[in-house]
């Protein structure tokens, strides 16, 4: 996406060109085959009829649609507009108004041949001797008009940055294409809001490593805070010469500069720092933990007012842990081994009922995961069972998928469960399925909540917890670290002790027991199959590592015999390595979550 609305107060056409430029420098982190394949959606907002806003709109549309986009060879096939960005009212006899500046918000889209070629801002600390290189499409102008720095000092003085040359954007695409094909690029971030300093800090946050910026500039303020278009890439120092050659070939050699050194091989991980040098002099140095707390402070204060204040404080305080390695993985099995392969080779594909109800939305990913593991995934809606088009007798495995059945208005999963409990035929059908020793059942997220309401029908489900509103009092959508526990769950066979990241997305995921006696009985049964853990692998009650405040950090559980497994996290959303926003480099096609589905296939033999 791209938007540079504040610039419209200085130069409306420049704000439009910069919005497109920002959208493009964002999307070029992905391996786009050709710039012509990029399509734009334009959202125009203006106070039509007010002052000179109509003239600004005309000139900006002309600059964007009639000049820049044709020069770039891209088009804007879709968009929308809001033409009444002004409100007028009277207060105590005085006429008042509030008018928004002309705004253009650009969304860029492009097909990809392989999403695994997408670069992220995460600095690679395992690579020896790396550096950051700036490709400055502003070509040293460093215009500060409309910048975040100007907003801090309440001034709009100065000249607005601009995309002065469409040919430079085309050249940038060519440079990235060539460098990517030679495997030179390790990390990527665009320069935008906040300027070069913010870009470097965000890359350091993502990589959890120190960065030393070295500015060969007599005007460090402009160099650090101008929001000219540009990108910053991480490359190996050994590739520096080749990258310079490619930049020269693209016509960008004179605006390509080495700007920083990156700490390598985990050096400084315990207390990494950002240091800014200019002409050999240290201008600034601070720990990443202090910078990240500053970066998060405004959000923290808002969160403390809106959400559970204790959770807000715990999340903010977690930034003080300088030893926190962030997301990590430690597995007790080979993630690249396909243990289901021998069973798939037989040609037998057990049928799994991918069960859904009104409001459920996770059935496609779930079917894909089971299909990859060697099952025949069949879409089964509750109405299919109610009207007799399908019966659970046809299946050896049942999976209840995630979503928001009946909008959670009867409690998460409650309405779905009552459809079964209050219908004699359905109740008998589910009870018979759960009692059959040759069946497996899985409930994920909303399906987990639903199956927990059916515990009276499930053998060995005594003392199961219910799932209540998150402690944070908010919907939680994030990657959380979990640890596989020692349980009888058929889905988690031979995974005990493994720690990895998994997707969570729920508003009512807090496992809660009706009494301390139930909690003690549950613990004695070894039915806890998965727990939320911190970065060191220890179960935790602290937010956000425990995203919902679950009792005893319970993320998943099983029946005593292990045939029925429930979990709030979503393994089906991250079963491929490429679905994870971060993963170790030695993971090939599959992620640890895929093992759950392959264990189910192995269980069937």
Q: What is each of the regions a protein language model found here?
A:
Residues 39, 75, 438-440, 563:
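Proline-centered loop/turn at the N-terminus of a beta-strand
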Residues 5-8, 32, 58-59, 75-225, ...:
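Intein/HINT protein-splicing elements and their conserved insertion hotspots or analogous self-processing inserts
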Residues 388-390, 427, 431-432, 464-605:
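Amide-donor transfer/coupling interface in amidating biosynthetic enzymes
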Residues 32, 69, 96-100, 122-126, ...:
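Solvent-exposed alpha-helices and their adjacent loops that cap or buttress functional pockets
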Residues 3-10, 47-55, 152-165, 417-421, ...:
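Glycine-rich tight-turn/loop motif centered on a GG-T
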Residues 278-444, 448-460, 468-476, 551, ...:
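N-terminal beta1-alpha1 cap of cysteine-dependent amidohydrolase-like domains
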Residues 232-236:
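Short hydrophobic/aromatic beta-strand micro-patches
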Residues 9-86:
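A glycine-rich phosphate/pyrophosphate-binding beta-strand-loop-alpha-helix module
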